[in-house]
Each structure stands twice: as C-alpha cells, then as structure tokens.
C-alpha cells in the first residue's frame, strides 16, 4: 500500500470514529484543512519536475476525491442518525387512548335563564330581546318614572355617549324597556283590531337580559341579570299575577309546599305594587321569608305609552333577578362568585 492509499484508509477510519458532526469537522481538518495531510502533500509538489507534478498531482487528486467522498458519506450517516433519534423521541404511540377534553357547560345563571324561559314558555309567554344601550324615554319616561326620581341620577345609572342632554343614552337599568318596545310593536301589528273594537291578542311576554347599575357588594353587581314579565289584556287581574307567579316559583324550585307572600310596595310603573316573598317549608332555608320579585298592576300611564287605552286594557308586570334565584337554588351566598370566572367554582353546577 503506497502513501496515498494509506492516507485515504486513515481518513476513512478517522471519519468512521467521529460520533458527532463536531468530531467529524475536526477529523476533516486533519486531512483537508490548511495544515492537513493532503494539503501538505500538494505543497511538496513545488520541488518536482513538470512531468512528476503531472503524475503526482493526478494521484493526489484521486486520493482527495476519495477522502471527500468518505467525508460526505459520513456526514449523511450522522444526519440520518440524528433524524432517526429525533423521530424516535417524538414518536407517537397510536395505540394509546387520546387525551379527553374536559366537558364544558353552561354558566349557572344561563341555566337559570333557560329554566325561566322554559317555564314561562309553557304558560304561553313569548321572549323579548332588545338593546342594552337604551334611550332615557324607554328606560324611564315611558315607565312613568318622574324627572326627579333618584334612579335617574349618575349615582345609580351609567350614562353613555351618543344621546343629547334632553334625551341621553344609558345602559339600561332594568329590562322593562324591552316590554314597552314589544308592546308598541304588538299594538302596531294589531291596530286594526283595536280600532275596530275587536279583541286584540293578549300581550304575554318575558324580557330576560343583562342590566347595569352603579352598585357592587356581596349581593349586588354593576352588571346583573333581570327578567321582567308582562301580561296585558282586557280581563287580566291581580289574581292572574298571583296564580302565574305561584306556579312559576313552585316549578322553578321544584317544591309544592312553597308559600308566597305579596307585600304592598311602590314602583312608578305599577299601581298597586307588591314585593313577592317566598318561604320554604323544608331544607336549610325553611321558615325564612326571601324576597324574589317586585310586581304590580301596570300603571295607566305606562299602558297609555304602549299605545293602548287604560280604560279598556289592563294587566300586570313583574321583575325578578335570575342571579338571586340562582343563589337561592344552589345555596350560594356571594353573587360575585358567579362572575369571577373561576372554573373550579362554576364547574360544580354542570
């Protein structure tokens, strides 16, 4: 074996011993670097004759090509080995069971709202929807709220841009404006029957949704939910209110021994007005009177603002807080827990 064959064999063995790309580069420098063995052989050709240079140069080039081929082959082997190691590390066992996603669910207040809509829907009530940014007229004036009523102050109501000093816009403080909007459209639709003295289809509607007031403590939130109800016809009485709301409460709380109490109260939009309390006969709240709603016979001025004659049409309205009903149903004492977004708490109600 001559000198060049020995050099090629030595290079191949050195490359084969290189276990990493860095070691391979060091081995390459020993043979192909500026001071490598092949480079030194080429420098030594300077003392040779032209004929010897030709023969010697051709032999050195053949050896160099063999070394470079061995180097390229080893580089590919190391790259393949690195790829296989990476694939092995990232390999997926398709026989393993998949990771199950946690099951989501409705918010407890949403569950309550659906329950309310379902119960009143079974009684023939429709569901109304409307804007959360309301006009002063629909939120206060149409509901017989005096200009100097405390509820109109900035301490109780969130006013927003877009209105005028005479007709400001605000975040609705209750969902009663939706009742008025619904009633106005209902009256327009059946105006021909009304003017002809014929019977108009009764207005039976509930208006659930978000409302806003400047208030925040354990039992109040700046944003809270309300559900208002309205039933207007020619022969609707306070007795109907008592029957409807009693049936609702017994169905909602799934309790036949529930007792309701109507306490005289005052609201600008109803006359007479009453607070509605309930009393459980069993369970942790047994014997306690708990306020759940306000109610009353719709004030003649409100009936008139709906486009109806209060001498002919009469009805009742009620308003309750789904948030409070949710607290009572699930035994939660702090309203803010429902809106903190803690999945650990909310997941208990699924």
Curated annotation (Swiss-Prot):
Pfam families: Phe_tRNA-synt_N, tRNA-synt_2d
PROSITE patterns given in the database record: AA_TRNA_LIGASE_II
GO biological process: phenylalanyl-tRNA aminoacylation
Keyword line: Aminoacyl-tRNA synthetase, ATP-binding, Cytoplasm, Ligase, Magnesium, Metal-binding, Nucleotide-binding, Protein biosynthesis
Residues that bind Mg(2+): 271
MF-aspect GO terms: ATP binding; magnesium ion binding; phenylalanine-tRNA ligase activity; tRNA binding
Cofactor: Mg(2+)
Intracellular or extracellular location(s): Cytoplasm
Cofactor note: Binds 2 magnesium ions per tetramer.
UniProt entry tagged with the keyword Cytoplasm: yes
Catalyzed chemical reaction(s): tRNA(Phe) + L-phenylalanine + ATP = L-phenylalanyl-tRNA(Phe) + AMP + diphosphate + H(+)
EC number(s) given by UniProt: 6.1.1.20
Cellular component annotations (GO), alphabetically ordered: cytoplasm
Subunit structure: Tetramer of two alpha and two beta subunits.
Protein family membership: Belongs to the class-II aminoacyl-tRNA synthetase family. Phe-tRNA synthetase alpha subunit type 1 subfamily.
Protein name in UniProt: Phenylalanine--tRNA ligase alpha subunit
Gene assigned in the entry: pheS
